[in-house]
Regions:
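Structure-specific nucleic-acid interaction/processing domains
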Residues: 1-16, 20-86
Length: 86
């Protein structure tokens, strides 16, 4: 399985990525091993993920979140609704 995931830190920064080993990747983020999130701190929490059988599907979904404002905004809205119950 491949996972597209969203992490959030205490300051509210979101990070979107994909991985075949979600648990290990989150630990990498929290330990500062991931260059792209090192400057954002180590206090990341997993707030959302999707699972895919195919790596290309996961890569394409991650790209859609990062490249399309409407897809990203829809994701943020869905996460807020889930967390806040709004």
């Amino acid at each position: 399985m491949y996972y597209v995931y969203v992490l959030k830190n205490k300051r509210g920064n979101l990070y979107i990525g994909y991985s075949a080993n979600l648990k290990r990747r989150i630990l990498d983020h929290r330990s500062g091993k991931v260059y792209t999130t090192r400057r954002l701190g180590k206090d990341f929490e997993l707030i959302y993920y999707e699972a895919y059988k195919d790596i290309e599907d996961a890569k394409n979904r991650e790209k859609s979140f990062k490249k399309s404002g409407s897809v990203y905004n829809g994701l943020v809205k869905r996460i807020k609704k889930s967390i806040m119950g709004a």
